[in-house]
A protein has these predicted regions:
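Conserved lysine of the Walker
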Residues: 7
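Anion (oxyanion) recognition and catalysis
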Residues: 16, 58, 133
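Anionic group-transfer/hydrolysis microenvironments
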Residues: 26, 68-71, 104-106
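A glycine- and Lys/Arg-enriched "phosphate-lid" helix/loop adjacent to the NTP-binding pocket
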Residues: 81-148, 152-155, 161
Length: 162
């Protein structure tokens, strides 16, 4: 889902589940590390990290829960720069996830210096749903307060990870 939609909060709560590999949001770490405003090509470097982590999870034959992924990077590139690296598009279509849990922006915006779109969350949410549908990937919308979101997500994951 879009910025400030509860992805990281939900991700951190799901890390208690066993049988999964977890990928934290690398974009924040990368942007903090470069010590300058990010640029278009930085998103490609972030994508390379995610692809490596996805490949590691596949080699280990473990299900993967990711705070953000290549879809987020694809939308980020297209929304901000009106273009996207072919590596991101190809990697996403080559190894699509089995399911997206898409966090609804129905919770209050929380300021963060790396966040850029406080007024565009519903628009971005719609873009996520459109892209996921275009890619033909299953998804579930996660909404409500944090405890409801966690219950929803755990129920979904338990049903597909029997």
């Amino acid at each position: 889902g879009p910025e400030s939609s509860g992805k990281t909060t939900l991700f951190n709560e799901l890390k208690t589940l066993s049988g999964f590999n977890f990928i934290s949001e690398y974009s924040r770490t990368y942007i903090d590390k470069i010590n300058r405003p990010y640029q278009y090509n930085d998103i490609l470097e972030i994508a390379k990290f995610y692809v490596k982590e996805i490949e590691t999870a596949r080699i280990n034959k473990r299900s993967l829960i990711s705070d953000t992924d290549l879809l987020t990077l694809l939308i980020w590139c297209e929304y901000k720069y009106d273009k996207c690296h072919s590596f991101i598009k190809e990697s996403l279509t080559k190894n699509p996830p089995d399911l997206y849990l898409v966090c609804s922006p129905n919770i209050p915006w929380e300021y963060d210096p790396q966040r850029e779109n406080p007024n565009n969350r519903v628009e971005l949410f719609d873009i996520y749903l459109k892209k996921i549908n275009e890619l033909g990937i299953d998804f579930e919308i996660i909404e409500g307060n944090n405890s409801k979101r966690l219950i929803q997500a755990k129920n979904i994951l338990q049903n597909i990870h029997l």
